[in-house]
Amino acid sequence: MDGETAGEKGSLVPPPGALGGSALGGAPAPGVRREPKKYAVTDDYQLSKQVLGLGVNGKVLECYHRRSGQKCALKLLYDSPKARQEVDHHWQASGGPHIVRILDVYENMHHGKRCLLIVMECMEGGELFSRIQERGDQAFTEREAAEIMRDIGTAIQFLHSRNIAHRDVKPENLLYTSKEKDAVLKLTDFGFAKETTQNALQTPCYTPYYVAPEVLGPEKYDKSCDMWSLGVIMYILLCGFPPFYSNTGQAISPGMKRRIRLGQYSFPNPEWLDVSEDAKQLIRLLLKTDPTERLTIMQFMNHPWINQSMVVPQTPLYTARVLQEDKDHWDDVKEEMTSALATMRVDYDQVKIKDLKTSNNRLLNKRRKKQAGSSSASQGCNNQ
């Protein structure tokens, strides 16, 4: 670990007029708003240069609580109304089921600028898809996918019950607490979250591969955005590739927007051949293009595939093998999405829609060519 130098420690100082205080505050009860601590975060935490991740509004660093030695994650946000909103929404959700906990928040000066520092529990188990990729030959089953979706749904249910829309539910924001088998999956990064009771959600900010159709145009949107994202994540969990693709190398192409708007996707074989009809039906209900027809979170949680996950078939899926084979591509996709997160403010009325006849799922075509060249490819599922 790289400890902070005296210079680094000195760069994170209390704002003018701030008073000292004590150590690790622990997570507040869900929904409780607290004021940031005004003394230096380095009084309580030893900072590292190790970057754990990049959020929508700031990077996340490794840190250690000085008294307990507890390893934590520190997110630095330069103070702004947007940053305050992120802290507020995450604080309201912190302590909820399957949501990353906030331990402390500080208001300090960094390089002469006021900033907010969010200390969170460290999610040492890594991202959802990385964990599945690393399984090797161990089969990933439909029942496991159902259990994962139930956990994600539990987090969304908690947020929606408090009239918070997350608006950026995606695999990269779903992290495990540890590498252990009993690790808990949790949702993080509230950089795009908004309260749905104050005003209609009209800001076109999102990660393109998991965006609901109504976000792609001037229509208002709400919690149903999160339900659409659940459908996309569920689709990927069950086969290893997303239902919608950009064919141009852009983060989001006109053709991809068109397919999302029209709800154009399929369940191609062999990856979907043995997946249950219940699972496919649930995906169809989540990917409805009309938000008023899409399932609510309560309906999702009450669907048999979710609330009776113990009777979901333990069918081996292609998911782990597909994710492993396309690992380099998935890293590229994630980079595209990360770079697009804060900048996607598109005037969709000005975009020329690409002819669907010229649109192909290039990743799926690539997989099919590989399968055609190997007579054993169609048996891959049985060898996981």
Curated annotation (Swiss-Prot):
Outline the segment boundaries, as ranges, of region: Autoinhibitory helix: 309-345
List the residue ranges of the region (Disordered).
1-33, 359-384
* p38 MAPK-binding site as annotated region, ranges: 347-371
Motif range for Nuclear export signal (NES)? Answer: 337-346
PROSITE patterns cross-referenced by the UniProt entry: PROTEIN_KINASE_ATP, PROTEIN_KINASE_DOM, PROTEIN_KINASE_ST
Q: Print the keywords alphabetically.
A: Acetylation, ATP-binding, Cytoplasm, Kinase, Nucleotide-binding, Nucleus, Phosphoprotein, Serine/threonine-protein kinase, Transferase
Entry binding sites for ATP: 52-60, 75
Q: Which BP terms does GO give this entry?
A: macropinocytosis; response to cytokine; response to lipopolysaccharide; toll-like receptor signaling pathway
Boundaries of every Protein kinase domain copy: 46-306
**Is the keyword Transferase assigned to this protein?**
yes
Q: Quaternary arrangement and interactors, per the entry?
A: Heterodimer with p38-alpha/MAPK14. The heterodimer with p38-alpha/MAPK14 forms a stable complex: molecules are positioned 'face to face' so that the ATP-binding sites of both kinases are at the heterodimer interface. Interacts with TCF3 and with polycomb proteins, such as PCH2 and BMI1/PCGF4.
| PANTHER family according to UniProt | SERINE/THREONINE-PROTEIN KINASE (PTHR24347)
Q: What is this protein called?
A: MAP kinase-activated protein kinase 3
* Taxonomic path: Eukaryota, Metazoa, Chordata, Craniata, Vertebrata
Q: Which gene encodes it?
A: Mapkapk3
